[in-house]
Amino acid sequence: VFALQETKLQAGQATLDLPQYLEFWSYAERKGYSGTAVFTKRAPLQVLHGLGSEYLDTEGRIVALEFPEFWFVDVYTPNAQNELARIGHRMEWDDAFRDFCKGLEEGVLPGDVPVERADADGLVVLAPEAPKDTPRHPLGAGHMPKEVLPCTEAGETSSPKPVVMCGDFNVAHNEIDLKNPGPNRGNAGFSDEERGKFSTLLAAGFTDTFRALHP
């Protein structure tokens, strides 16, 4: 499994010759912006495209794949921007992302999230309102825009299981994570607010595996 962030593509804009991999993309509504993708040799049970927030799910920042043993979450966290112009949005995102991951860990799916699931023939299930001429693809074989996918319903559950998250978190948690922490203190990615939210994520029971292996 490998994950990409900031793909900046829309559905159908790229054709990759990776026959051994299934591919799952999340797209931003704004063209040429943001986006995430996951490529896997193992077929997932289902794939979520978003956190379950109409406000936060317009930029294609989440692809979450459920496997029998764990959830794999690819994330591209919003940048707080110069002078922390987007810090409020960032704080909302960090809280929603933490709740999303804890929910998956506990077996609770967010509602109203576009989801890829295969039917008995292995083809992606389409939303009832999807256009009649929408092409059907095997799971992971096509670029499925979220507009043609069904959405999860509030209260849906899955099996509780570990969550593995990776991607661009847009934060340097501690001074050891930056070459020159002093001049960057308070800047986007190294503000007290963002560092604090990452601490809260770890306090919720998750582990920074890179730092655990390289203290």
Residue ranges and their predicted role:
Residues 1-7:
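Proline-aspartate-enriched helix->loop->beta-strand connector
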Residues 2, 39, 72, 168, ...:
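A residue-level signal for conserved active-site and pocket-lining positions in enzyme catalytic cores
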Residues 5, 26, 212:
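Conserved residues at the C-terminal ends of beta-strands
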Residues 5, 76, 166:
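A cross-family glycoside hydrolase active-site/sugar-binding cleft signature
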Residues 8, 13-89:
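Structured beta-strand-rich core segments of catalytic domains in phosphoester-bond hydrolases
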Residues 22, 96, 101-131, 135-139, ...:
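Metal-dependent phosphoesterases centered on the DNase I-like endonuclease/exonuclease/phosphatase
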Residues 87-97:
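Charged helix-capping and loop-helix junction motifs
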